[in-house]
A protein has these predicted regions:
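Extended, compositionally biased flexible segments
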Residues: 29, 37-108
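Non-transmembrane, aqueous-exposed alpha-helical and coiled segments at domain scale
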Residues: 2, 10, 14-18
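Short, structured patches in soluble enzyme cores that scaffold and shape functional sites
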Residues: 100, 108-110, 117-122, 158, ...
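Conserved metal-binding segment of the jelly-roll/cupin
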Residues: 89-109, 120, 215-237, 243-247
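Glycine- and acidic-residue-biased ligand/ion/polar-headgroup-sensing regions
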Residues: 53-78, 177-178, 183, 189-221, ...
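Conserved hydrophobic/aromatic beta-strand scaffold that supports enzyme active sites
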Residues: 37-41, 58, 95-97, 117, ...
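Double-stranded beta-helix
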Residues: 87, 111-153, 208, 243-270
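A short glycine-rich, His/Asp/Glu-containing loop-to-beta-strand
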Residues: 15-49, 56, 145-192
Length: 270
């Protein structure tokens, strides 16, 4: 395995995450993405406080049920939001955007509660924001093209259309078994992080990161440098889900990807 592959493919958490807060990446851990990632996992009927964040942060509910209370600043609380998510593959998430200095109080219900926290440098907007599932933009991409071999569902939670002024764009992809996503291969000037889950414990897929190809399993991460081509495929029999987070550059907010020239013909292929 090359040094580039070790930096771009993280596999330390394949056994899953324990209760509590687990740091996967902090800002500055990698030389090229500068995206922090923490997993927050609560046992049923327990609580957890997320103290005021030092940089703007996105919190995405991955599973369970409970209440999320946003705290714009110390001593101030917004009304609690009831959240629930039974299945990554069929339900869009509740998500929360936290500016610098804001925090959260979490109270798990009878199914526990699990959230991903993703942070990038900067302030963000002035106030925290809740993006409920019915405001997530869900698109069926690649449907009806090349026998559905790259048909997938893309869920965009936050981008320039609804989260202007934030330092990130993020969402999810549901990759059907045996099919491609993030396809045709593409790149963009902004760095990106993927976090993976599968519908079966033994599920797996493959990720292209530039000229490297890696085998991905549940709880793996891949990291894409600025301008680095990437695409994904899930093994037959195993549906794949992944969270994607793009860090906006100071003078270049992510809008659309740039597809690799030799594969652009696939955009209109039947």
């Amino acid at each position: 395995m090359t040094e580039t592959t070790r930096e771009s493919h993280l596999t330390l958490h394949r056994g899953g995450f324990p209760a509590g807060v687990t740091k996967v990446l902090s800002l500055g851990d990698t030389r090229f993405v500068d995206i922090a990632f923490y997993m927050v996992k609560l046992e049923p009927n327990t609580t957890q406080e997320v103290p005021p964040v030092f940089h703007q942060c996105a919190a995405i509910v991955l599973g369970g049920n409970g209440r999320v209370t946003l705290c714009p600043k110390r001593g101030e609380e917004l009304p609690a939001v009831e959240v629930s998510r039974a299945d990554l593959f069929t339900e869009p998430p509740h998500s929360f955007l936290l500016p610098r200095g804001a925090g959260m109080k979490l109270a798990a219900g009878d199914r526990g509660l699990e959230l991903a926290l993703c942070s990038v440098p900067g302030q963000g907007q002035a106030k925290p924001v809740h993006v409920p599932p019915d405001q997530v933009r869900c698109e069926e991409r690649g449907e009806g093209q090349l026998a559905g071999t790259f048909h997938r569902q893309v869920r965009t939670v936050a981008d320039s259309s609804n989260a202007k002024g934030w330092g990130f764009v993020f969402g999810e992809v549901v990759n059907q078994a045996g099919r491609w996503s993030s396809y045709p291969p593409h790149h963009h000037p902004q760095p990106e992080l993927y976090y993976y889950r599968f519908d079966k414990p033994q599920g797996y897929g493959h990720a292209e990161i530039g000229e490297q190809v890696v085998k991905v399993r549940a709880h793996d991460f891949t990291l894409m440098r600025e301008g680095e081509d990437h695409a994904q495929v899930s093994a037959p029999g195993y549906a794949m889900w992944y969270l994607w987070v793009i860090r906006n550059l100071k003078d270049q907010v992510y809008d659309t990807p740039e597809f690799t020239e030799e594969h652009r013909w696939l955009l209109s292929a039947k």
